[in-house]
């Protein structure tokens, strides 16, 4: 295997404080040329998955990583679709307010099939975390003709606290087409087909009875009734689909079709955007998790900044929020006053001690810049981290808070499927 060459150029230390600025938003749709690097962890089916964006298709590598280089990204709505044999399809939506190195974090759910039944008799399955009931003679062919043969059913309970397993970006639209920020309390996926792969559906006026167990640590915030949402794979958003009623530690509802169904807390939403920076204004290159906090507890906590520190996400509307950025083992908070419309927060400075920024270049054995690749960084005191290489260059933040910390950098060239020895 040919070796890649990695050149380390710069090592800096920064300290910072938190400050937030507001700016007037714009409603005009703008397209930016961006880099996209997505990660589908191998334990979430990430190896060899097919990823599509705007008519371009690629595949995840042995670490579940994929890249789209110099692609046009909308300031309003973008959709990435991920498929793999034996897994449920995954869809992620995102947006940007600048040319960015965008990070997409997702996962695939393995199909659990074998719950088949005869449509003439129906089915009643009672599990520990979810249950479903199909009434007899409630299924038809796509043409509307009654279907009474075998139904091949795949069903799955999805942990509402596992953000990589839940499709979309936790945004839904109600019946009036208003956007809402969602927090799942339970998610069920159902998929069915007839003999020989026949397309079948629920008959008009027939429903499936669903119930889902509410996690113990979410019971205190679970209301007596909640909006039921189904996932729209065409738009990448959840859609209002009914009401679920709480019965003890469960939510129960009737639905008219199979698919992804979510029992979600919801707040009317507005777009916020900004940029995380260090004290001197340089970007925070390593993505940090974003928590939206109301009162003393996190309510929405499923976002992440991009590889260049930028973010553009949905947040609860007209509510005082604390935005917590988890980075380097510590939490950095920025308070946000009520946003009744799209808010641009400007630069948010993070208080990061012991931080060092490393920049460098990656070239192949012919001394040509690696156009599409990434750096695998390992250290003796942190998990494995992946950093994008863009036009032969990379930027990384390392949180050196322990004496004796050692980091190794492994450059990977995606286009030529090459990996070098560590530097």
What positions do the PLM features span?
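Long, contiguous ectodomains of secretory-pathway proteins
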Residues: 130-207
């Amino acid at each position: 295997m040919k070796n890649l060459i990695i050149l380390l150029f710069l090592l800096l230390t920064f300290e910072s404080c938190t400050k937030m600025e507001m700016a007037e938003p714009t409603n005009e749709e703008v397209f930016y040329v961006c880099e996209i690097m997505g990660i589908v962890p191998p334990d979430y089916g990430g190896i060899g998955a097919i990823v599509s964006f705007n008519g371009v298709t690629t595949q995840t590598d042995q670490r579940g990583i994929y890249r789209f280089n110099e692609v046009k990204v909308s300031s309003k709505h973008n959709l990435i679709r991920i498929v793999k044999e034996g897994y449920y399809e995954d869809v992620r939506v995102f947006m940007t307010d600048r040319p960015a190195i965008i990070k997409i974090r997702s996962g695939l759910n393995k199909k659990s099939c074998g719950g088949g039944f005869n449509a003439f008799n129906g089915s009643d399955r009672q599990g520990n975390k979810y249950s479903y009931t199909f009434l007899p003679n409630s299924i038809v062919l796509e043409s509307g003709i009654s279907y009474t043969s075998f139904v091949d059913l795949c069903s799955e309970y999805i942990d509402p606290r596992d953000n990589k397993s839940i499709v979309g970006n936790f945004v839904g639209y109600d019946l009036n087409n208003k956007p809402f920020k969602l927090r799942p309390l339970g998610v069920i996926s159902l998929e069915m087909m007839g003999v020989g792969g026949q397309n079948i559906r629920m008959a008009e006026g027939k429903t499936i009875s669903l119930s889902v167990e509410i996690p113990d640590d979410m019971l205190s915030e679970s209301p007596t009734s909640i909006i039921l949402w189904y996932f729209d794979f065409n738009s990448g958003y959840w859609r209002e689909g009914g009401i679920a009623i709480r019965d003890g530690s469960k939510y129960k509802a009737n639905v008219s079709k199979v698919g992804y169904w979510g029992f979600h807390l919801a707040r009317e939403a507005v777009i916020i955007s900004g940029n995380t920076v260090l004290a001197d204004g340089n970007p925070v290159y390593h993505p940090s998790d974003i928590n939206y906090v109301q009162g003393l507890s996190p309510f929405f906590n499923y976002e992440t900044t991009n590889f260049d520190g930028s973010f553009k996400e949905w947040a609860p509307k007209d509510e005082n929020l604390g935005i917590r950025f988890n980075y380097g083992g510590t939490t950095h908070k920025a308070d946000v006053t009520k946003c009744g419309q799209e808010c641009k927060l400007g630069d948010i400075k993070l208080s990061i001690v012991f931080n060092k920024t490393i920049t460098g270049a990656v070239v192949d054995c012919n001394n040509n810049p690696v156009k599409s690749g990434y750096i695998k960084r390992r250290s003796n005191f942190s998990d494995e981290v992946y950093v994008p290489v863009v036009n032969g260059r990379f930027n990384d933040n390392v949180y050196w808070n322990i004496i004796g910390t050692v980091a190794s950098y492994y450059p990977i060239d995606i286009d030529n499927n090459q990996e070098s020895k560590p530097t």
